[in-house]
Amino acid sequence: MSNQDLINCKSNSGLTYAKAGVDIDVGNAMVEKIKPFIRSTKRAGADVEIGGFGGLFDLKAAGFTDPILVAANDGVGTKLKIAIEVGIHDTVGIDLVAMCINDLLVQGAEPLFFLDYFATGKLDPEQGAAIVSGIAVGCQQAGAALIGGETAEMPGMYAKGDYDLAGFAVGATERSALLPSKDLAEGDIILGLSSSGIHSNGFSLVRRIVQQSGLKWGDYAPFNPQMNLGTALLTPTRIYVKSLLPIIKTYKGIKALAHITGGGLPENIPRVLPSSLCAEINLSAIHVPPVFSWIAKQGKIEETEMLRTFNCGIGMVIIVAQHAVETITQILEMQGEIVTLLGILTKHPTKKILYKGVLHL
């Protein structure tokens, strides 16, 4: 054996970052795969070129004069476990964007940019690229630029194939257009926009119900025979920006919005109400999608628990003045939204939400 062979042998026996489980070359390969998705989210104020130490956004180029910045962050929760087990990873990317962006929207903000955090035990470039492709689709739906993110390969932290996601979004609104407005009053009307399904809350309970039912992800969904169960449950969260933002910016008829996520109607509507007002909701008016009826029946879940765990068919609540109801409803329906007249604001000394009727589960 030559001296050079001895040197090569010694160098090959030494530890490397890749041998410890973190392969920088694989990470670089994934970056190349996702660049086209990222470029597809370009908008005024951002060039969406990645590789720097931070993402840049030009507020002046976005057309703001007296802006207030609004920030939000969120995740997808245990819906990810279904995505991992089914092997469909793009739709949870849309969920990630939706959970953050809809929270910006309720304060009247136009989404500007988005950043993601993707953590896994062993990086799979195809899996990662699928996730980012979904994030890009969500950003396109929201009009937000995907200006950066972090991919963390952490051996020993996650089981094989598992991953977690977190999203961070920033938007802006003119100071005068910040929601909720200060003129919320008794008699204002409460409208609801239909959800696309479960969205991204309550999946720990959903997964327990599926487990107890004995169903497999590949079985036909009992609530939708045209789809298998896994695909149906992975229907992505609806993003309401393109329907609501033009009304917020031009018509000025919306007084408040509430994104119906964890806690459902009873926890989220009161977040936008002043102390003197109460939301009176007619539960009988809600068209409950079949997936929620199946969940309630299969899990023997009471109405109150359904309402505080799931959106039950209403993904966004809108509060408007009575004179604006007809116009706003027409605009939203032209945008493809299903609008429900949910109720009215009343005065109550202690209650923040009151129910009439029953939820037709």
Curated annotation (Swiss-Prot):
<comment type="pathway">
    <text>Purine metabolism; IMP biosynthesis via de novo pathway; 5-amino-1-(5-phospho-D-ribosyl)imidazole from N(2)-formyl-N(1)-(5-phospho-D-ribosyl)glycinamide: step 2/2.</text>
</comment>
<dbReference type="GO" id="GO:0005524">
    <property type="term" value="F:ATP binding"/>
</dbReference>
<protein>
    <recommendedName>
        <fullName>Phosphoribosylformylglycinamidine cyclo-ligase</fullName>
        <ecNumber>6.3.3.1</ecNumber>
    </recommendedName>
</protein>
<keyword id="KW-0436">Ligase</keyword>
<keyword id="KW-0963">Cytoplasm</keyword>
<keyword id="KW-0067">ATP-binding</keyword>
<dbReference type="GO" id="GO:0004637">
    <property type="term" value="F:phosphoribosylamine-glycine ligase activity"/>
</dbReference>
<keyword id="KW-0547">Nucleotide-binding</keyword>
<dbReference type="InterPro" id="IPR036676">
    <property type="entry name" value="PurM-like_C_sf"/>
</dbReference>
<dbReference type="InterPro" id="IPR016188">
    <property type="entry name" value="PurM-like_N"/>
</dbReference>
<comment type="similarity">
    <text>Belongs to the AIR synthase family.</text>
</comment>
<dbReference type="InterPro" id="IPR004733">
    <property type="entry name" value="PurM_cligase"/>
</dbReference>
<dbReference type="InterPro" id="IPR010918">
    <property type="entry name" value="PurM-like_C_dom"/>
</dbReference>
<keyword id="KW-0658">Purine biosynthesis</keyword>
<dbReference type="GO" id="GO:0046084">
    <property type="term" value="P:adenine biosynthetic process"/>
</dbReference>
<dbReference type="GO" id="GO:0006189">
    <property type="term" value="P:'de novo' IMP biosynthetic process"/>
</dbReference>
<dbReference type="Pfam" id="PF02769">
    <property type="entry name" value="AIRS_C"/>
</dbReference>
<dbReference type="Pfam" id="PF00586">
    <property type="entry name" value="AIRS"/>
</dbReference>
<dbReference type="GO" id="GO:0005829">
    <property type="term" value="C:cytosol"/>
</dbReference>
<dbReference type="InterPro" id="IPR036921">
    <property type="entry name" value="PurM-like_N_sf"/>
</dbReference>
<dbReference type="GO" id="GO:0004641">
    <property type="term" value="F:phosphoribosylformylglycinamidine cyclo-ligase activity"/>
</dbReference>
